C-alpha cells in the first residue's frame, strides 16, 4: 500500500522501532514483573490506567522524534522533499498513515493488559475499550498542539501531563460508582470523537504542509 510505503520512507526507522515494537514489549515486561511481585493484586482496573498512562506518554513524546515541530514555520526538517514532484504527496500519505497507525498500536499495547485481566478477573471489554478510545483520542488530538513545540523539555512536561490525565481518567471513569452506568455512553462519545480528531488533525497538518511549500515558492 502506497500510504504505508511513504510512511516508512518519511519516518525515522528508530521512531517506528521504538513506538511500534519496543513499547509493546516493554509494557509486557513491566506487567510480567508486577505480576511476579504482587500476583493477583495487580490485575485490576488500575493496570488499565497504568497501561493507558504509559502508552499516552510514549505517544506524545515519541512523535517529537518522528515528526517534530512540523507545524512551525522553518522547522519542517524535510525540505529535501520539496525537490521532488511527489514529495508533498509522500508527506501527506505519511501523516495520514501515522494517524491511522496510532489507534491500532494503542489497541495492541492495551491488549497486553486485557488478556491477563480477562483470565484472572473477568470480562475486560469495558476497561479495554475505554482505555483504547481515551488514549487514542489524546494521542491524535494532542498533535494539534505538540507539533508546534520545539523544546524537548516542554515536550517532556506535556508527556507527563498526558500520562497523568490518561491514567487518572481511565481509573476514575471505571471505578466511580456515579460514572460506571455512563461508561458505554462515554465510550460512544469517544468513538465518535476519534474519527473527527483524525479528520481535523489531518486537515491541520495538510494545511501546514501546503503553507510550507508556498513559503518555499
Indicate residue ranges for each PLM-predicted region:
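Hydrophobic alpha-helical transmembrane segments of membrane proteins
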Residues: 1-76, 92-217
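Short helix-to-coil transition segments within interhelical loops
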Residues: 81-89
Amino acid at each position: 500500500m502506497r500510504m504505508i510505503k511513504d510512511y516508512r520512507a518519511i519516518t525515522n526507522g528508530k521512531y517506528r522501532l521504538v513506538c511500534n515494537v519496543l513499547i509493546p514489549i516493554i509494557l509486557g515486561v513491566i506487567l510480567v514483573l508486577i505480576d511476579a511481585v504482587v500476583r493477583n493484586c495487580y490485575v485490576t482496573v488500575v493496570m488499565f490506567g497504568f497501561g493507558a498512562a504509559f502508552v499516552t506518554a510514549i505517544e506524545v513524546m515519541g512523535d517529537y522524534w518522528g515528526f517534530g515541530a512540523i507545524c512551525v514555520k522553518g522547522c519542517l526538517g524535510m525540505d529535501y522533499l520539496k525537490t521532488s514532484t511527489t514529495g508533498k504527496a509522500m508527506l501527506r500519505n505519511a501523516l495520514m498513515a501515522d494517524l491511522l497507525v496510532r489507534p491500532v498500536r494503542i489497541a495492541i499495547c492495551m491488549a497486553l493488559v486485557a488478556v491477563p485481566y480477562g483470565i484472572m478477573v473477568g470480562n475486560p471489554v469495558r476497561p479495554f475499550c475505554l482505555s483504547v478510545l481515551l488514549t487514542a483520542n489524546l494521542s491524535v488530538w494532542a498533535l494539534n498542539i505538540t507539533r508546534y513545540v520545539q523544546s524537548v523539555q516542554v515536550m517532556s512536561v506535556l508527556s507527563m501531563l498526558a500520562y497523568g490525565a490518561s491514567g487518572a481518567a481511565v481509573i476514575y471513569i471505571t471505578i466511580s460508582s456515579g460514572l460506571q452506568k455512563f461508561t458505554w455512553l462515554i465510550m460512544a462519545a469517544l468513538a465518535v470523537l476519534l474519527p473527527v480528531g483524525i479528520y481535523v488533525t489531518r486537515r491541520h497538518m495538510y494545511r501546514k504542509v501546503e503553507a510550507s511549500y508556498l513559503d518555499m515558492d
